[in-house]
Amino acid sequence: MSGIIEAKKQLVEQIADQLKNSVSTVIVNYRGLTVAEVTELRKQLREAGVEYKVYKNTMMRRAAEQAGLEGLDEFLTGPTAVATSTEDVVAPAKVIAGFAKEHEALEIKTGVMDGSIISAEEVKTVGSLPSHDGLVSMLLSVLQAPVRNFAYAVKAVGESKEESAE
C-alpha cells in the first residue's frame, strides 16, 4: 500500500514542478469531446510545444497547493485537463481558445500566467494575441517604416533632380 502512496506523492511533486516551471497554464473541461477531437487537440498542442495531460482533481489540488497557487481548487471539478508551456506564454491559450471556438464542448475553466490565476475570459484574450515572434516582427516593421519612407523620399528627390538637370 505504501508503494501506491509513494507513487501518488511523486506524481503530485511532478505536477507541482510542472506548474512552477511553466510560463503559461490553461485548465479545461474536456467533457463532450470525442476521442478524435481530443486526439486532434493533443496534436495541435504538441506542434505548438505545449504539454497536455489529464490528472485527477485531488492530485491537481495537492500540486497547486505545493506550487503556491491558492484559489485553483474551485476550478478543479469534473473532467479536468491541463495544458502547460515552459517557453511560449501565448501558445496554450492560443491553441485552446482556437480549438474551443470550433468545438463548443471544450470549456476553458481558468489559466495561470506568471504565478497568478487568470479567468477564462482573460485566457481567451491572451489567445487572441500574436505569438512572441509575431509581436517582434510587428515591432520591426513599425520601426522600419519611417526609415523606408525616408529612403523612398530621398530617392524621389534624387530622381526629380536628375530629370531637371537633363
Swiss-Prot record:
Gene expressing this chain: rplJ
GO CC terms: large ribosomal subunit
Biological function: Forms part of the ribosomal stalk, playing a central role in the interaction of the ribosome with GTP-bound translation factors.
Keyword line: Ribonucleoprotein, Ribosomal protein, RNA-binding, rRNA-binding
Protein name: Large ribosomal subunit protein uL10
UniProt-listed HAMAP family: Ribosomal_uL10
One GO biological process term: translation
Organism superkingdom: Bacteria
Source organism of the structure: Staphylococcus carnosus (strain TM300)
Gene3D superfamilies in the record: 3.30.70.1730
InterPro entries assigned to the protein according to its UniProt record, in alphabetical order: Ribosomal_uL10, Ribosomal_uL10-like_sf, Ribosomal_uL10_bac, Ribosomal_uL10_bac_type, Ribosomal_uL10_CS_bac
